[in-house]
Amino acid sequence: MIEEKNIVEDYIRGGTQKNFYTEQDSVFCSCPLCDKNDYEKIDTEKGLSIVRCKNCELIYTNPRAIDAEKNYYGEVDIFYNEARLIFKGTKKHHRDKNYEYELEKIKQYKSKGRLLDVGTNMGFFLRKAKEMGFETEGVEPSPSLAEIARKSWDLTIHTAFLKEADLPENHYDIITLIDVFEHVTNPKDLLNRSYSLLKKDGIVVIKVPNGDYNLFKMKLGKITGKGKGMDIWDCYEHVVHYTPGTFRKMAENAGFKVKASFIPLPIHSPIWANLVGHYYQYPSPFILDWKRVLLRNLFFYIGRIEFGLFGKSRFGPDLMFIIEKG
């Protein structure tokens, strides 16, 4: 296990997240889907712009933070302490219900087999997959997070980006990218690499924030005047913002076809930082966060109906896709 250290009073999460990004902190890029440079700016957050490609309609952050993945390159102790009671087995993770739901969905298509998780973080999703009988393996570029996942859950974790990891081709039944794909600056390359690692009848499972939901929140914030200062896009770390249509284009361009798509359970992020000044990964007490939880659940159910009728949704916070080789 990781050695536990005392939490300092002025608790700071690991990594390099900034409140504002200057020209020196950011870099311009072409569209990650069609490689064009013809776009319109639709929002600004933390000094970074959210734009929409005029050619393919992909929404992406441009300019984006340089080395955005280093938000997760902090010290082991700091990351460990924000979830230490989970590692001790006395608390659940605030996303455990989400992970169980997502794995049950996966089991509808692949009930067992080799599962490669890309962007494993501290291993919370992968340890659930292991508990549910999958043969698990993970890839995590952050040395700190990979170390925690490896030592805390006895998981096989490669400390690398997927493109660098020494992995066998045509080997995996399932590749998962849960809340990861939106962080990837080169999504086409990642899909191509996933294609080569996947068995002929394998599946890739990808969960991302819903770009249409963020657009709705952005417009609502402007109408109500409450949008200023809100982290709607999380653009300091989210570099691409997918809608059902743009994700489908990205997947099909890499040789995949979309087997299934749906609105997954909403994430109820904890509010400990507001309550006690520290960020922890345990669920917030319902009595202190009930309004936000109920509203998010209401949006989820409305969004699921809307998605079933129209194939897209303004109310579902996230999207989940199961894709297979075409």
Locate predicted features.
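S-adenosyl-L-methionine-dependent methyltransferase catalytic module, highlighting the catalytic core
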Residues: L177, T185-S196, I203-G326
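Conserved N-terminal segment of class I S-adenosyl-L-methionine
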Residues: M1-I178, P187-L191, I263-P264, G277, ...
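Preference for short coil/turn "hinge" residues that link or interrupt alpha-helices
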Residues: L155, A160, D201, I232-C235
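Structured helix-beta-strand junction loops
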Residues: M132, S152, K200-D201, A254
